[in-house]
């Protein structure tokens, strides 16, 4: 999930239901094998059967359920380990049995969101920049290596 789009990534048609579309800034939870939580920052995509897009039915801020789930993932890992399967995963029952603390005053969570939201936005922006730089490197490096391009840079001044 953290690799984003690779050469092995299966492409998906844009004509998929909105319920399985993911966009930058979405919170994703991998419930099989890796059991991870992440802030998606790899562009538009589609979910597969092993990844959930996490949202709040009660209008809690994204940062609240992101960090709650991030803290709870160790509990899920213990549940998966207890099943003694070759590839750890959790079931729908595990999700339904799970509980998290919810503040009586949602304004606490919303105040936290005001502070954390810009950090989430920056994470997405930086990941987008990393992807652009990676593409540039991957296209320029072969040209440099085989002599089709050169740098006009004097290393002796460093």
Question: Where are the language model's segments positioned?
Answer:
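Sequence-specific dsDNA recognition surfaces
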Residues: 1-24
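Short, compositionally biased
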Residues: 39-53
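Short, charged beta-turn/beta-strand-edge "cap" motif at the junction between a beta-strand
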Residues: 33-37
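Short, flexible turn/loop "capping" segments at secondary-structure junctions
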Residues: 44-46, 90-93
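Short, conserved catalytic or interaction motifs in soluble domains
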Residues: 56
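Short beta-strand/turn micro-motifs at beta-sheet edges
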Residues: 39-41, 84-89
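A generic structural signal for residues embedded in beta-strands
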Residues: 29-30
């Amino acid at each position: 999930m953290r690799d984003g789009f690779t050469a092995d990534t299966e492409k998906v048609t844009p004509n998929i239901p909105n319920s399985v579309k993911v966009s930058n800034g979405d919170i994703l939870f991998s419930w099989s094998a890796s059991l991870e939580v992440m802030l998606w920052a790899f562009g538009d995509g589609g979910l597969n059967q092993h990844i959930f897009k996490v949202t709040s039915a009660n209008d809690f801020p994204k940062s609240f359920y992101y960090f709650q789930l991030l803290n709870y993932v160790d509990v899920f890992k213990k549940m998966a380990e207890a099943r003694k399967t070759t590839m750890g995963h959790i079931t729908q029952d595990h999700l339904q049995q799970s509980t998290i603390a919810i503040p009586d005053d949602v304004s606490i969570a919303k105040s936290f969101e005001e502070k954390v939201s810009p950090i989430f936005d920056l994470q997405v922006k930086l990941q987008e920049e990393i992807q652009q730089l990676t593409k540039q490197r991957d296209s320029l490096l072969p040209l440099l290596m085989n002599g089709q391009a050169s740098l006009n840079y004097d290393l002796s001044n460093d």
